[in-house]
């Protein structure tokens, strides 16, 4: 069987609230770490979310 291209990642809030999103990325084409500005409902603002491993 072939190795799956899509892997699950966790996008963790940089506001240190502990809030996170879970998404998928193609590990073969996107080798760099992802970073998005998304909504954090704990601080009720848009903040940067950075990629971390799912434990």
From Swiss-Prot:
InterPro entries per UniProt: Ribosomal_bL33 (IPR001705), Ribosomal_bL33_CS (IPR018264), Ribosomal_bL33_sf (IPR038584), Ribosomal_zn-bd (IPR011332)
Biological processes per GO annotation: translation
Cellular component annotations (GO), alphabetically ordered: cytosolic large ribosomal subunit
Signal peptide location: none
Stored PANTHER family: 54S RIBOSOMAL PROTEIN L39, MITOCHONDRIAL, LARGE RIBOSOMAL SUBUNIT PROTEIN BL33M
HAMAP family (UniProt xref): Ribosomal_bL33 (MF_00294)
Name the record gives this protein: Large ribosomal subunit protein bL33
A GO molecular function held by the record: structural constituent of ribosome
Cited Pfam families: Ribosomal_L33 (PF00471)
Keywords assigned by UniProt, alphabetized: Ribonucleoprotein, Ribosomal protein
UniProt superkingdom: Bacteria
UniProt record similarity statement: Belongs to the bacterial ribosomal protein bL33 family.
Source organism phylogeny: Bacteria, Pseudomonadati, Pseudomonadota, Alphaproteobacteria, Hyphomicrobiales
